[in-house]
């Protein structure tokens, strides 16, 4: 499984694996998954919502958000610690994932100024985050899925812990992480995935560790033992995830769009760091922005 697939799987893979397991485990699992997914459903109010018809197998986009609230008992709005745009195109049999740095310098609608990308969620939740990314990339953002930091921790614990191959020795939050294969519980996985200041690659190194944690979760979810613990997994998902995709939408994606998951292309919107008023940002030049915009437009069949 490619790194891109592992990122995509943290949000859809867990749900779809459980859904597809219904065939072998019967009506009770179907009912439990349905009820849990109903709890995650949360529509968004947008001035101009981009519509897509999943019944016609049209390409669609989804904004994937990892939110830095829910950990350590925090309940405030939080910010989007991770932002990924996913496009799913069954005709081309491809899913494209583009990561956007949290410090990307962007216009945030209604704020009258430019700011960090991850502040959009703090100012206006998923709706404003979707509007901000839609305006910045000049593509329609059809749906969103968000999961908070508590969700990551609870998912790791629900699957009984994970293993990752670590390539950097460092300490974070009282935990020591050494080079090689290491075992992580939920608290350790959270600390492992959040470190960036000791990493020579900064935020990009942090994103790499997030992908490794995702890989560990997905590997456990795909195992028989993890599926048998589906109640704990469903609880972690339903308590910590929000999306405007209904359970019926997820079923359509699982069954009608699976050809698009055979090829997953991963990309990163690359910026250059700069300081302004003592705050660090990432600025993306026009050539790089245009490159990514066109890549996503091609996948969504838009001009």
Swiss-Prot record:
Where's it found, cell-wise? Cell membrane
List GO BP terms, alphabetically: cell wall assembly
* EC identifiers of the protein: 2.7.8.-
Which terms in the Gene Ontology molecular function aspect does this entry carry?
A: phosphotransferase activity, for other substituted phosphate groups
Side Cytoplasmic, residues = 1-6
Q: Which EC main class describes this enzyme?
A: transferase
Protein name, entry field: Polyisoprenyl-teichoic acid--peptidoglycan teichoic acid transferase TagU
Q: Which organism is it from?
A: Enterococcus faecalis (strain ATCC 700802 / V583)
